[in-house]
Amino acid sequence: MKFTEHLSAHITPEWRKQYIQYEAFKEMLYAAQDQAPSIEVTDEDTVKRYYAKFEEKFFQTCEKELAKINTFYSEKLAEAQRRSATLQNELQSSLDAQRESSVVPGLRQRRKAVFALTHEERVQHRNIKDLKLAFSEFYLSLILLQNYQNLNFTGFRKILKKHDKILETSRGADWRVAHVEVAPFYTCKKINQLISETETVVTNELESGDRQKAMKRLRVPPLGAAQPAPAWTTFRVGLYCGIFMVVNLAVVMAGYHFLQGKNVWPMVRIYRGGFLLIEFLFLLGINTYGWRQAGVNHVLIFELNPRNNLSHQHLFEIAGFLGILWCFSLFSCIFGLSINLQMHLNPLILYGIMLVFLVNPTKTFYYKSRFWLLKLLFRVFTAPFHKVGFADFWLADQLNSLAIILMDLEFMICFYSFELNWGKSEGLVESAKSVCNSYSYGVRAVVQCIPAWLRFIQCLRRYRDTKRAFPHLVNAGKYSTTFFMVTFAALYSTHKERNHSDAQVFFYLWIVFYFISSCYTLIWDLKMDWGLFDRNAGENTFLREEIVYPQKAYYYCAIIQDVILRFAWTIQISVTSLNLFTDAGDVISTVLAPLEVFRRFVWNFFRLENEHLNNCGEFRAVRDISVAPLNADDQTMLEQMMDQDDGVKNRVKSRIWKRSQSMSLRRPRLSSQSKMKDAKILIDDTDDEANT
């Protein structure tokens, strides 16, 4: 593998700009070689002056790159040292509290037997668990910094060697010895010391001396490109996709043969939600593949465990497996008409299997990922009671595009409860008009508003935490338009069914709020979620200054499809109002539902790209995990103090507060360090420990 490819595959994406610009140096050398005056048409002194001038410019550029790398490395090393001190203080506090609570072991054991764990014991257990996770993430950040150190040194060595080869000189090697090999980023070995200390602390203090267990916890995933999936996973993906296509064809043929002249809409509404969920999972697999290929660190953005998370192959496998179940269930439902089987049992079995797959408590079938999803769903539905993270509102946004699944679930419950004739085998294709598909009882309107309500209260919670009206209250206003839109749609539908004269008034109000909602969400998609239409876009017209995906056409096509699909409701309303054909509303909504899932699939690419670029701007490459983080009010107060012009002048007034809140930078003495002297952290001495 060429070093350019190796560098591209192994860099930390959020630090991309801080690495040596190896490709730019290569282009610089090749351009100098191509543009050099020929010795055949000019004198030797002119050629020497040309190369001397080029080398002066080349080494000046090398000095700038070296200074950039030294500065960034020193900053990240200082940050790592501060983080190490903080974690060790937290660990020491937790261990001290644990020792204090075990002063009376006999009484404690008896109390455990009677009352189980006390609140203090549960808190201590949770703190230790959080500390293990925090040290694991900190260790990952150290490995990333060590990798940064090694890649940049190798980059300088390679490019200076190439310089000497092209120019037939040894000045590149001399410059490397004189500058690179004595540079702080290369000579400073404190990163190795921090790595060793972290391994020792985790082994002795958190894993009771079991080094194998400690290193398994600290294991860092490969820093290169995504590792290939196991052969059996790839085989199963292909097998499931092949079976799905064959059975899907059989479903179409069976439906054409057995369902002619029957009212299939109850069955369609019941099975439609399952299909949309499978489509969503498959497209999410494509999202994951695209993010990995483009260098968008979705693992960090969603705060997943970098050592254990689902790849695109796993998502394809799950989607394929569920797709086969869906096809067999639908085929059995249709084919059951010819042999008098109870067709209405098939959907119950299908969704029962899906539910069991999700909540299965055994540690099988992607247990950690399923548990993460269940925990995230719980956080989404309890949004007002805790701080909202990116994964929380991302999932709530997905639910807004999957709202029809909730509506179909409501229809299914209503249909099975009130309309289904359980004694007939053809219960899902009866010709009776469905009341459950209307807004008559108001439940359907409430269900339709649930996803928008979740995002609405998330925005209010974020406003409470940050005290920033923009963007959070403005974003909440965007989701509130859905409430008006659904309300007027329900009023129009019920008044029209009862032939009330004011139905047209509600129809026009529905159209107005639908238009306002579509414009609102479209502008927010393009400007806020995707960060497009930046004034400083430069050559990336109508986009942003920096883009991740290789072709600008991707962005322009995404803008066009977002505009079209945001206003696709106009087709549905027009066709339904004109009543161009039978069941026009159901047909159009069934076509538009998968298209909305596709729109959200495209949205995901650019929403995470925008978040990734924000992380790049902050050079954030690992999760921020602390046992005792600042609460939202403290964080807001600190930000306000930092924004004040006289904040520095008046800092003496808060000296008492600072003294009580600040943390000593002296490392706490743990049992694993009992023979080591206390050492203060040195922030500005990254060049005083040369080791060449």
UniProtKB/Swiss-Prot annotation:
The keyword Transmembrane helix applies. The chain crosses the membrane at residues 239-259, 270-290, 315-335, 339-359, 376-396, 402-422, 469-491, 504-524. InterPro entries: EXS_C, SPX_dom. The keyword Transmembrane applies. Residues 158-165 are annotated as: Important for inositol polyphosphate binding. Residues 260-269, 336-338, 397-401, 492-503 are extracellular. Residues 660-692 are annotated as: Disordered. This is Xenotropic and polytropic retrovirus receptor 1 homolog. It comes from Xenopus laevis. The lineage of its organism: Eukaryota, Metazoa, Chordata, Craniata, Vertebrata.
